[in-house]
Amino acid sequence: MPFSVTSDSKYVFFERTKRTWDEVDVCSVNTSTLEVKELIHEVDKPYRDPHARSVEVLNDGKDILFRSERTGWGHYYHYDGQGNLKNAISSGPWVSGHIAAIDTLQRTVYFYGYGDDPKINPFYYRLYKSNMDREGATLLTKEDGQHRVIFLKSKRYFIDTFSRVDMEPKILLKDNTGKVIMELAKPDLSQVYAAGWKKPENFVVKAADNVTDLYGVMWKPSNFDPEKKYPIISVVYPGPYFGFVPTNFTLDDSYCTRMAQLGFIVITVGHRGDTPMRGKAYHRYGYGNMRDYPLEDDKYAIEQLAQRHSFIDGKKVGIYGHSGGGFMAAAAICTYPDFYKAAVSCSGNHDNSIYNRGWGECYNGVREVEKVVKDSLGNETKEYEYKFRVKSNAEIAKNLKGHLMLVTGDIDKNVNPAHTYRMAQALIEAGKDFDMLVIPGAGHGYGSADEYFEKKMYRFFAKHLLGDTRADYWGDINRSK
């Protein structure tokens, strides 16, 4: 939480978290005496999610809103300024997400929620309203879609923009009861459709447990022929702090539309452990196994789609991902080497022992070991060691059978290029053939070299999944006559 200071500057509120990420305190400190008072203490095993957490100090420190997953579902709780629990604000087998607005005069909280209606995609943001002094939430945006709202200063009205990948945006002015006042704008996409653009399609499959529903999106070529068979490419991101699967209307998303035009079925699908938006049990699925947890679900989702649709060639499977998705793409082709035939792995954190320490220790787990140490006089003191072990892609590089392209920028400040270099070294030591692209001057994103990378990726997949040897030809299509 950010620091919050009372208007008289006498008290500062802050949050502190244990290194094992499973205990958190909300505290106040007296700026005159420097006395620290613990107001809220929360134990949340195996970890408290650092990205979905939320603490709001209101009314000059008299009210605190604290988001907790203590019931297995993320909801808000109202405490007074001394840390006494007053009431839950929301409850039930669904998730209360980030706060959109707070009206302190009316003591009303507006927040997004997910998964309250089993008939609607649980990843869709929908706006709810609660009085902070009692339990209960009212849904204000009932339309089936992904909602984004902007409140007017008075909090009496808000602009609601909602869409789906297969539905154009609608922009409505509503009052704070959810009543529609008027439609503000309507997009005209007639020229886009006239050019041949096709909407992607939503789908639902089962996770590898054959119980959990997974939600995905499929892109087809604009000249799609249901009588043909198409290779399939899975565009992935493992989370665990958010899911990648798009939910709102867009003309392109992470190369998916453009890649499909080469003659591929392109999908992106969720998996257990990818996001906190579906409750604690779903989100913590990957704890202790950062490398492997999303792989089985991705493979099983593709197998189901290939069985469901005769136009999908389940023997020609590719996978692409960036950052955590790059980590996942390389892990997938080395874990299931007979299933995935080609993988493009970009800027992947292939060895989380050298990535951001907090990231790995939170989502994979760190073990606290207490020991007693004696000094030269025999005095005993307690010390703590923290032990961290995580699986790396280098450990399974020897399994590679298909075609792998590694990509990194050479000045990546997020995922150090050493991750890719370690993976490359392991592949070389295992005698594996692979492609590699290092982009000079590029960081975690590829900037002006992005188009260059994009063409390299398209040619790579065309060659290894379509068998198109013309992909070895290099030319600038923007300058062709």
Where in this protein do the model-derived segments appear?
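Hydrophobic helix-coil surface modules that form long, contiguous segments used
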Residues: 14, 22-24, 33-43, 241, ...
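Beta-strand C-termini and the immediately following turn/loop, strongest in propeller blades
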Residues: 13-20, 55-71, 89-90, 103, ...
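Residue-level recognition of a conserved intra-blade site in WD40 beta-propeller repeats
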Residues: 5, 57, 101-102, 151
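Beta-propeller domains
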Residues: 1-24, 44-62, 73, 95, ...
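A short loop-to-beta-strand structural motif that recurs across blades of beta-propeller domains
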Residues: 25-27, 75-77, 126-128, 170-172
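Active-site-adjacent structural elements in folded domains
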Residues: 40-43, 47-51, 61, 93, ...
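Multi-bladed beta-propeller domains
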Residues: 1, 29-53, 79-105, 114-119, ...
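Serine-hydrolase catalytic core recognition
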Residues: 9, 15, 146-481
